[in-house]
Design a protein with these regions (language model features):
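DNA major-groove recognition helix of helix-turn-helix
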Residues: 176, 188, 225-226, 237
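Alpha-helical bundle regulatory/interaction domains
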Residues: 1-160, 164-169, 179-184, 198-201, ...
Length: 242
């Protein structure tokens, strides 16, 4: 979950505790202090999040394009971003069933989620509660390896990854849809966009940054930023640059 914020809103990430990096990517906290109900742009990043909004636990499913979230002025969100390859096993369903959706955890877990929400409503620390939910999660090592391949600055092409991971092409497609909510090619596009945001500050121009991130040329970058983020490359960097 990568957000666009007003100048007075705040977003802070905290690293996962030692020993949980294979299950938790990070913890985060967002406070909305802009115009009431002003939309917040959430970029796809290859992850899913568990979010406590003060009333309910929400699962932010895997996005294939930017989502616009309406958040009340003064609202505080506490979230946990799951490590890749963890969500399907933890939640108990393939992630393609949650693609581009925000779903109450109670719809998936029933009374168990209600008990956790009661503890949060009574004032228990959201970070500690969210971490406890993930303590028994079992990562999928081959899906984590795939994510690492595609996320790296020297990203591997999708072609050939199935054999490297010990899958047929068909099995890889199914496993990716279960683990990430979409196929490897979509994951590759999403992680390339995130890589562009990471690498852009190193370059004076957009074309050099695009090539470094793995785009074939500047028009390729422009197509992907429009389709995935709903923004031009320059607008994307202005709103989400690191």
């Amino acid at each position: 979950m990568t957000t666009t914020m007003s100048d007075v809103s705040s977003y802070r990430e905290m690293p996962a505790p030692s020993g949980m990096h294979d299950r938790v990517a990070c913890l985060w906290r967002f406070r909305q202090a802009g115009i009431a109900g002003a939309p917040v742009r959430v970029l796809p990043d290859g992850h899913i999040d568990l979010i406590w909004d003060g009333r309910a636990l929400i699962v932010a499913g895997p996005d294939t394009a930017a989502a616009m979230a309406s958040i009340d002025d003064g609202a505080v969100l506490n979230g946990l971003r799951l490590a890749p390859g963890v969500g399907a096993g933890l939640l108990g369903l393939p992630l393609h069933r949650l693609a581009n959706q925000r779903v109450a955890l109670a719809e998936l877990w029933g009374a168990r989620a209600n008990r956790v929400e009661d503890a949060l409503a009574e004032g228990q620390d959201p970070a500690a509660v969210l971490l406890a939910l993930c303590a028994g999660a079992v990562p999928d090592p081959r899906m984590q390896r795939l994510f690492g391949f595609l996320q790296s600055d020297e990203a591997s092409p999708v072609t050939g990854l199935a054999a490297a991971l010990g899958f047929s092409e068909r099995s890889l497609r199914r496993r990716c849809q279960d683990a990430f909510g979409y196929g490897a090619k979509t994951l590759d596009r999403i992680l390339r966009l995130q890589r562009f945001l990471k690498l852009a500050p190193r370059h004076a121009g957009l074309t050099a940054a695009a090539l470094d991130a793995g785009y074939s040329d500047a028009p390729h970058l422009a197509r992907d930023t429009q389709q995935l983020a709903g923004l031009s490359p320059r607008a994307l960097l202005a709103q989400h640059g690191r």
